[in-house]
């Protein structure tokens, strides 16, 4: 792992001999989570057994798991095993906990898969099941204080608490909704139920405590800021109609950089103050 100083272009080697997979840094930069993969059983002979509809796709029998690499001593520790792949969702701000998910097929009922979400104590490896075989579940990320999770899911998730489609029996599953769950009480709040655009979370900012979303807003992709304190959304006044990338300082949300296009330019980078 090499660090590059953009101002001076000086390079510094931080780590050597780490596992040759992609990885995620812990918030304190004292360990990495990486993703070892195991290949599935190979079929021999002229006939091939189709285990499930997804088994028709090449390489779907392979499984990916999670492992922890300790930077101080170079020791790797396997964290997950099993018949289903496991996916890292987030690491708590203090680096003590990890959220991961699994998914399995469910060919008899929409959306034809079931997802589970787990919280792991990285010191004791104790596992707390947050959701088991939940339909329509998406991703999860920690709040800055580690006491809540920001969830994304279909309006149909969690018993349909995010549905806002009148008398229509089926909500639009492509209309991604955002929810906040309190880890102490397990109460879930559908924060985008009355917000029209489809959302994709960018960051729950430490500086102002607000959540920033990229949205599909009609013909545009706009950036909105949500205040959990006031339960309100605010559209950022940007120079672009379609914002393809947006990033802001973790502790100073007054400074951001973004890339996008409008009716008179394309692929332009801006600073937002």
Where are the regions a protein language model picked out?
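A flexible loop/linker signature enriched in serine peptidases of the S9 family
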Residues: 1-2, 16-21, 35-65, 80-86, ...
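Short loop/turn segments that connect beta-strands within beta-propeller blades
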Residues: 5-9, 70-74, 121-125, 182-186, ...
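Residue-level detector of Asp-centered blade-edge/turn motifs that repeat once per structural unit
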Residues: 27-28, 93-94, 144-145, 206-207, ...
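Serine-hydrolase catalytic core recognition
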Residues: 208, 245-273
């Amino acid at each position: 792992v090499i660090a590059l100083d953009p101002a001076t272009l000086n390079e510094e080697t931080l780590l050597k001999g780490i596992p040759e997979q992609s990885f995620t840094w812990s918030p304190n930069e004292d360990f990495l989570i990486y993703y070892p993969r195991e290949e599935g059983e190979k079929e021999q002979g002229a006939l091939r057994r189709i285990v499930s509809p997804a088994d028709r796709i090449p390489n779907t029998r392979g499984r990916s798991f999670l492992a922890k690499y300790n930077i101080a001593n170079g020791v790797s520790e396997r964290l997950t095993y099993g018949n289903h792949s496991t996916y890292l969702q987030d690491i708590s701000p203090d680096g003590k906990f990890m959220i991961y998910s699994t998914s399995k097929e469910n060919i008899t009922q929409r959306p034809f898969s079931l997802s589970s979400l787990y919280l792991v104590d990285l010191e004791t490896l104790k596992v707390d099941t947050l959701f088991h075989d939940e339909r329509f579940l998406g991703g999860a990320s920690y709040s800055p204080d580690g006491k809540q999770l920001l969830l994304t899911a279909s309006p149909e998730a969690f018993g349909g608490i995010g549905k806002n489609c009148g008398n229509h029996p089926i909500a639009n599953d492509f209309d991604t909704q955002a929810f906040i769950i309190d880890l102490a009480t397990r109460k879930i709040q559908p924060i985008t139920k009355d917000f029209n655009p489809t959302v994709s979370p960018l960051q729950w900012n430490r500086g102002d405590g607000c959540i920033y979303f990229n949205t599909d807003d009609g013909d545009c992709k706009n950036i909105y800021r949500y205040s959990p304190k006031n339960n309100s959304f605010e559209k950022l006044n940007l120079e672009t109609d379609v914002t393809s990338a947006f990033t802001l300082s973790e502790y100073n949300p007054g400074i951001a950089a973004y890339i996008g296009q409008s009716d008179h330019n394309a692929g332009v980078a801006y600073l937002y103050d």
